[in-house]
Amino acid sequence: MSMLKPSGLKAPTKILKPGSTALKTPTAVVAPVEKTISSEKASSTPSSETQEEFVDDFRVGERVWVNGNKPGFIQFLGETQFAPGQWAGIVLDEPIGKNDGSVAGVRYFQCEPLKGIFTRPSKLTRKVQAEDEANGLQTTPASRATSPLCTSTASMVSSSPSTPSNIPQKPSQPAAKEPSATPPISNLTKTASESISNLSEAGSIKKGERELKIGDRVLVGGTKAGVVRFLGETDFAKGEWCGVELDEPLGKNDGAVAGTRYFQCQPKYGLFAPVHKVTKIGFPSTTPAKAKANAVRRVMATTSASLKRSPSASSLSSMSSVASSVSSRPSRTGLLTETSSRYARKISGTTALQEALKEKQQHIEQLLAERDLERAEVAKATSHVGEIEQELALARDGHDQHVLELEAKMDQLRTMVEAADREKVELLNQLEEEKRKVEDLQFRVEEESITKGDLEQKSQISEDPENTQTKLEHARIKELEQSLLFEKTKADKLQRELEDTRVATVSEKSRIMELEKDLALRVQEVAELRRRLESNKPAGDVDMSLSLLQEISSLQEKLEVTRTDHQREITSLKEHFGAREETHQKEIKALYTATEKLSKENESLKSKLEHANKENSDVIALWKSKLETAIASHQQAMEELKVSFSKGLGTETAEFAELKTQIEKMRLDYQHEIENLQNQQDSERAAHAKEMEALRAKLMKVIKEKENSLEAIRSKLDKAEDQHLVEMEDTLNKLQEAEIKVKELEVLQAKCNEQTKVIDNFTSQLKATEEKLLDLDALRKASSEGKSEMKKLRQQLEAAEKQIKHLEIEKNAESSKASSITRELQGRELKLTNLQENLSEVSQVKETLEKELQILKEKFAEASEEAVSVQRSMQETVNKLHQKEEQFNMLSSDLEKLRENLADMEAKFREKDEREEQLIKAKEKLENDIAEIMKMSGDNSSQLTKMNDELRLKERDVEELQLKLTKANENASFLQKSIEDMTVKAEQSQQEAAKKHEEEKKELERKLSDLEKKMETSHNQCQELKARYERATSETKTKHEEILQNLQKTLLDTEDKLKGAREENSGLLQELEELRKQADKAKAAQTAEDAMQIMEQMTKEKTETLASLEDTKQTNAKLQNELDTLKENNLKNVEELNKSKELLTVENQKMEEFRKEIETLKQAAAQKSQQLSALQEENVKLAEELGRSRDEVTSHQKLEEERSVLNNQLLEMKKRESKFIKDADEEKASLQKSISITSALLTEKDAELEKLRNEVTVLRGENASAKSLHSVVQTLESDKVKLELKVKNLELQLKENKRQLSSSSGNTDTQADEDERAQESQIDFLNSVIVDLQRKNQDLKMKVEMMSEAALNGNGDDLNNYDSDDQEKQSKKKPRLFCDICDCFDLHDTEDCPTQAQMSEDPPHSTHHGSRGEERPYCEICEMFGHWATNCNDDETF
């Protein structure tokens, strides 16, 4: 590669993020801090080398991420005109770019608008980066890290090592960053270490964004200090911005930008910067007491900050040793020297001994405190290491399972690819066989055409018996041609399937490659993890004491307690969610009932539509009967015409006149009926969309019947013409009369053809409207389905959001409780001694661990939610694919129908061509006969004048026919206008229907909102009802008792009444019997009648009592039902009360658990105080054992070393956790890749659909041109018939001339010569006309053949060369320019369309009005004027 210009890219930072992975440590990296500025200046030259390495690694077509968050594919790599150096052009997946592949009028690649972007290769990554890396902190220079606050430390620690910036950074290792060694910390630089620790705490962007508040002290760009005055979004740029009031006039404004004020300050003191460029400053404590008390904390803070920066094990051990030395110096060496000096001064006297004893006791207390601190840290480290080892084991198992699954998937994909390859080979074999068959068929067709020519020559000699053979051969040829077409379509289908299989194999191979890459990466990561595990195994804590083990066990018990608490909370939350889900299911059931109502309404509308369809079918049946009667009358008229051929001229003319009047009447009736039907369709189309389908089907049947009748008429006409030819040979005298009849028949045929054309136009327009209606129905269905899916998704989202809100509220409540408890504990712990401080540190560590656990759980939940959303999007894309495939199948079926229609048209054209050939042969025979006759005889001038008169008469007839043609065309145009009006009305009705649909949709949405409001009100009412329930229960109980008592009373009363009625019935029956006996005895009519009346009264009374009994039974049943319902309600209320009581008990249990924890903490504090007293007692004993303390110091140092090792292991485990998080991100990226692949497949399907639509439009145009050619052929046929008639007239005139010559022999030879010359000239003229007509016929045949071949092969470019006689010599013409956006030819191409250009081609002229003496701001990063390097946006792209 050629040497590149220095791009001014920043050197990578030496600060390591907490989320980054562990890297290789350099062997020898030593450079003073004073040389950082020179290394920064020198970084411009090696940056070109890094760019070369980036360009070498990346390739065109590779999948990358711009700044770690914008996915796309590389389409360009190299130098550009708009800026020096190497640039990469990327096509993004989403329209969030800046161009369409062209910048400043120069095109580097082609893509959709706002999807193209140009960046430096160093900004590209092959994986999705974390947020802090993607925001641009990856490439901040070392000069920014050295703030004004830490200049003192930089000056004092001049010998601290720093890595050189010349080492390039490859993109294949995106997480690789250079470690920076931390300077040694001395006792003199406490304030500097405090400021450095404060700055290091604000290292991560996320923390900075969370902690920034208005009024905070911050640094902008690492150099400008100030106070935050504004936080939020602005009008001048997108994203979150921070408005800072600087300490010095180094800003750009006074708090206002572009006329809008965000805060108030002095001019040049205001500055706006993105949030990720602003870092918070912490202030060190100034009081000496606090500094002495928190010396250990400061040292720990500095060591942790330095550990975060340096990943290497050597730097970590050195920092831990430095920290231990710093913490131990004031306690051991300093005090020892002081005691020795005091012993030297005050040897004599008891006071000196007492002071020495006090100092030693203080020294022992400090040593004990440090020992306790170290023990606590070791315990924490061991517990943390155990947990991380368990997590590592789980991660290893998961990784092994994932690897096995990936291998299984790989095997499946390989089998799939092999099967696809086999299918491909089989399809290729089939293609070759089909091609062979096609070639054989073409050879057969050529042979048949040769034999056809021979047979036609023979048919001139023998007429009748061989005509049948020729017809059979023609039929064979047609069958062969049809089979050829079938084989061609088969071949086309096979080719398409081959292309589809190729695309599928390519996509599967790319998937396999990606999976193999992922496998290799995973295997490497596993190997690295194993190596680290083997290298970082603990050496075995042999010297750990029993006290440490006891503390570990106590901590484990606390952890178990917290876990049980968490599990209880989770179970309570699950129960809460279950209740919520039940309520949601009830709401869904209510919605289902509403949908059922709507479906019933739809069914009623459908029944109305069916009724309307029946009415329309009756109208069509009437119209059909009328058409049939008209066709029958037309056929009768044709038969009468045939009969009238044998009769005289007068009767024929009258019949023709009658026929014409009848036809005109028929046309008028037909037009009136069509107008009536159109009016009906206009009025009913909006309400009855399905009527059109039935009408169209029946119309098609009618048209087919008409076409059949027309074909029958044509066949009859052909037979009549044959008869006329026979009669011409027999009787030459009746030729003139027959010519007139034939002309009239031709006029009728022309009119029939016009009618057929009009009908064809109608059918084509009806088909177009049908297709539009189908498309509209499909779109409506798709929109309704999409809307329903959207509603479902919205409901699910709302439910999920509600659940999340409830969880957040509960979390906040618990966190507030926990914070209040921790505050109380801290207040108590401040009063305790150094041991209580150790306890507080333990609790802080525990809290940090819990926070980390919560963060990890939240990340895991987010990842699972994202995976679910990705799966949903995948399912949606699959559904869309299925819909597209269905549309594709519909269009392909339409294409096949159109091709079948073309084939039918071509068959008709071929039949007409055969007829033309027969006529041409007959014409040639006649011409030969005329030539022979003209040679033999002469003609007179009188005959010539007669000929001219006849010609004039025929020309007049032609003019009259042309006038009739124009009238017919006007009628056709009128019909077309009426059809257009119909289409406009149909579109209006469709628009109205769409509007109605939208209104209904809005009403449904309103109803939904009303239902939601009702649900809220119902919830409130439920709460009120719960309050009222307790009152209502007591009231209902009392009412129940009263009602039961009343019912019992009524039952007793009714039973008494029943008994009385029964007794009365029995008494009455006895009386009846007595009366009957008396009636028998008396046998009188009056007494019998009286008895009958009494019987009737008794029966009436009995029926009344029975009815009252039934009424009482019904009332009893009703009351029992009411009792049952009240009991059920009572049970429900009791259940709800029990649930509320259970919730109260759960909350009480939580409160008791919190109280128990507080009590345990109090007990722990008491135990610690007891331990303190015990330790004070032990201090006296330890004073005697000062000699042994030195050995303990050495053991203490060993413990410190072990602690440093454990700290290193902790850091490495954190790094591994970050690696696992990155693995999850990579899995997300792979899912996004699969989504992009599906979207690409969708775009391909859309492109195929557009191609098919274009082919359909081309075929329709070709159909129209074929119809126009058909009309031209018919006019030529009519001209041919006229010429044949002229030839026959000439033959008759020749015969008459011969007779006259035989009679008049006295004419002179000179006149005969002149007549012969005149006749010869006429014959030459006629011959030239015939030759011209033949040429026209040949040209038209060529055009028709070209059109048919183009329609079959799908190539429209061959039609440009049909006019050329020598096609082989001429070169093909260039294709015409066509714009798909504007739909116009010859203006411009789609790539050069002005509507596509969204940005101005020429950049605007820059005018600068500054003074020449001022220094213009220049950025070394962008290599542009207008701003300084400190104000540069790192994420700048083109």
UniProtKB/Swiss-Prot annotation:
Keywords associated with the record: Cell projection, Coiled coil, Cytoplasm, Cytoplasmic vesicle, Cytoskeleton, Membrane, Metal-binding, Microtubule, Phosphoprotein, Repeat, Transport, Zinc, Zinc-finger
Biased composition (Polar residues): 136-150, 1300-1310
Single Gene Ontology MF annotation: identical protein binding
Its membrane topology: Peripheral membrane protein
Coiled coil: 350-1353
Region ranges (Important for tubulin binding): 97-101
Transmembrane regions listed in the UniProt entry: none
Biased composition (Basic and acidic residues): 993-1006
Residue numbers bearing the Phosphothreonine modification: T50, T140, T182, T1310
PROSITE patterns per record: CAP_GLY_1, CAP_GLY_2
Known outcome of mutating M1213I: In a breast cancer sample; somatic mutation
Gene3D superfamilies the UniProt entry points to: CAP Gly-rich-like domain (2.30.30.190)
Pfam families xrefs: CAP_GLY, CLIP1_ZNF
A single GO cellular-component term on record: ruffle
Every CAP-Gly domain range: 78-120, 232-274
Subunit comment: Interacts with MTOR; phosphorylates and regulates CLIP1. Interacts (via CAP-Gly domains) with tubulin. Interacts with SLAIN2. Interacts (via zinc finger) with DCTN1. Interacts with TUBA1B, MAPRE1 and MAPRE3. Binds preferentially to tyrosinated microtubules, and only marginally to detyrosinated microtubules.
Protein name as catalogued: CAP-Gly domain-containing linker protein 1
Organism: Homo sapiens
Lineage: Eukaryota, Metazoa, Chordata, Craniata, Vertebrata
